[in-house]
Every structure is written in structure tokens, then in C-alpha cells.
Amino acid sequence: MAPIEPGASRTAGRRAGASTNKTKNYRVPVRARWLLVFAWALFIWSRSLFPGPESTAQSAVVVDILRPAFEALGVTNATLMSFLVRKAGHFLEYAVFGALLGSTPEDGRPGWRQVVPGLIVPSADETLQRFVPGRSGQLSDVALDCAGVAFGLFVTTGIRSVRRKYRR
């Protein structure tokens, strides 16, 4: 650090309002956050375009990986394992979607701009699946997907709330 001349201010030459904190506040612009939301929705929809047998084969790979954990928990029925993997997949991909939606409001509180896509995207996803060979759209999956969105929004909102509390 260069020596400061007598009578000179440490803040001389800094722009007004500039942070003196050495850690930078790296905020992702709102448009970029919405772009991530849109990209994740496209990812979800792309997964729904796989025909039934291919989707089942992908789930079987995950079941094989998780089989030791299932068996340790006493779950030995392969059909039940597949069902749990598929439903957990629904919930988790929509929890990520909800978390991304939760990152979009500037004030940290989700509003209609987050809730509406959180309802439309799962509904469109299940509708899309009705037109894919070997797939079906189910209302129970829409409900599970919406629960995942709500969970993601809840977690993101909670994290933002805690961060805001400790910033003060």
C-alpha cells in the first residue's frame, strides 16, 4: 500500500459510495438469473421428450447406483426402487427450478413472477409428456413438481432472509 501524504484522505480518488470492504459483492444480474430459470425449464422439458423405454432405462441406471442404499434401508422391490427414483427425480429437478426462481426477485421475496412459472412449467411438462410415445402426463406428478418448486422457493427465500439478517 502506498504511503498517504499528510492531510490526504484515504478515500481520495475513490468514487462516491464505493465499498471499502475487500470482499466484492458478486451479484448475478437479474436478466442472467431469469436466463438460468428459462434454461433449466428447457432442460426439464428436454428430459420429458425421451420416449418411455429410454426414460425407464435411464431410471434403471440410477436404481442400480442406489440399490445398495435402498437395500440397506430394507427396500428390495425393484419396482418400488424405480418408482422412488422417478418421483425423487421429479421433486429434485423442480426444487432446483424453484431455487432458481427464488433467486430472481430483487427484494428477496417471491411474488407472482415466481409463482406463475412455478405452476405453468410443471403443467406444461406433464402435458408435453402426453404426446411422447410410452409416456403419460399425470396430475400427481404436477402436484409433486409444484411441491418441489415450493421447496426450492422456500429454501432460497430462507437463505436470503438469513443473509439479509446477518448483513445488518
Give names to the regions the model predicted.
Residues W40-R47, G118-E126, L153:
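Alpha-helical transmembrane segments of multi-pass membrane proteins
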Residues R15-T20:
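Short, low-complexity intrinsically disordered segments enriched in A/P/G/S/L with frequent Arg
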Residues S82, R86, A95, A99, ...:
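Active-site alpha-helix of zinc metalloproteases
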Residues P122-C146:
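Interfacial helix-loop-helix junctions of multi-pass membrane proteins
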Residues F91-G108, A147-S161:
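Membrane-interfacial alpha-helical segments at the cytosolic side of multi-pass membrane proteins
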Residues P3-E5, N21-A95:
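"…centered on the first transmembrane helix and the immediately adjacent amphipathic helix/loop
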Residues P29-A32, D107-V115, Q138-L139:
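Membrane-helix interface segments
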